[in-house]
């Protein structure tokens, strides 16, 4: 199972998370988000992430110039598109930055299968999140049974995942590759090492010291 921890805003938290056996660390470049970081801040934060952990920049309906600024000025190796980006736009990114991974976030609503089929073949990974006008980060969950028909597609489950409900999700025997957490590893809006460690232990076993 893969783990992505997202929404980091401090070097201290990035350093702590990087000691755990997680797969990706995310930074949000979207001014309407409470976890928004400038490109300068993302450069500093992402530089503290070791090479074996993917460095993800989350953007919402960006233009190509924004993508260029992120990729030219930071060590980011994955772009997570969290809006209504077009296939043509994704192909533009891939054409210019062939080594960059593209993740597409989708809302867990009645159109989920249709939207997966739309983007399938153009992105490397899906994030399936709680439907929200604020494009994620709400801490709210959704009916995970909607994911039962999604098979043979690489995706992470996001949306209010925490230490209390993550084992419930696993009882549904879904085909997900892992989880994406932000609010579920926070206390009072700040990343919490105890919660991060607890999630790692649940998902990957007691391996944080390896």
UniProtKB/Swiss-Prot annotation:
Which keywords, in A-to-Z order, does the entry hold? Amino-acid biosynthesis, Aromatic amino acid biosynthesis, Isomerase, Tryptophan biosynthesis
Q: Which reaction does it catalyse?
A: N-(5-phospho-beta-D-ribosyl)anthranilate = 1-(2-carboxyphenylamino)-1-deoxy-D-ribulose 5-phosphate
Q: Could you confirm whether the keyword Amino-acid biosynthesis appears in this record? A: yes
Q: List the disulfide bonds.
A: none
Family that this chain belongs to: Belongs to the TrpF family.
Q: Which HAMAP family match?
A: PRAI (MF_00135)
Gene3D superfamilies tied to this protein: Aldolase class I
Pathway where it operates? Amino-acid biosynthesis; L-tryptophan biosynthesis; L-tryptophan from chorismate: step 3/5
- In the Enzyme Commission scheme, what number(s) does this protein have? 5.3.1.24
Q: Which InterPro entries match?
A: Aldolase_TIM (IPR013785), PRAI_dom (IPR001240), RibuloseP-bd_barrel (IPR011060), TrpF_fam (IPR044643)
Q: Which GO terms describe its molecular function?
A: phosphoribosylanthranilate isomerase activity
Which CDD domains does this chain map to?
A: PRAI
Q: What is this protein called?
A: N-(5'-phosphoribosyl)anthranilate isomerase
Q: What gene is this protein a product of?
A: trpF
Q: Look up the domain of life of the source.
A: Bacteria
């Amino acid at each position: 199972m893969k783990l992505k921890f997202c929404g980091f805003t401090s070097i201290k938290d990035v350093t702590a998370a990087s000691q755990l056996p997680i797969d990706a660390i995310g930074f949000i470049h979207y001014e309407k988000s409470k976890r928004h970081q400038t490109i300068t801040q993302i450069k500093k934060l992402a530089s503290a992430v070791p090479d074996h952990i993917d460095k993800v920049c989350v953007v919402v309906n960006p233009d190509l110039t924004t993508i260029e600024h992120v990729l030219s000025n930071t060590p980011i190796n994955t772009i997570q598109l969290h809006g209504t980006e077009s296939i043509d736009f994704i192909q533009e990114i891939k054409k210019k930055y062939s080594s960059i991974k593209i993740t597409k976030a989708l809302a867990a609503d009645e159109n989920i299968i249709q939207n997966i089929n739309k983007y399938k073949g153009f992105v490397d990974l899906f994030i399936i999140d709680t439907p929200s006008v604020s494009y994620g980060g709400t801490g709210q969950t959704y009916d995970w049974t909607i994911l039962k028909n999604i098979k043979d597609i690489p995706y992470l489950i996001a949306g209010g995942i925490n230490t209390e409900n993550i084992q419930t999700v696993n009882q549904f025997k879904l085909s997900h590759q892992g989880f994406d957490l932000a609010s579920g590893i926070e206390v009072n809006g700040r990343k919490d090492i105890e919660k991060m460690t607890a999630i790692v232990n649940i998902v990957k076993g007691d391996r944080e010291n390896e």
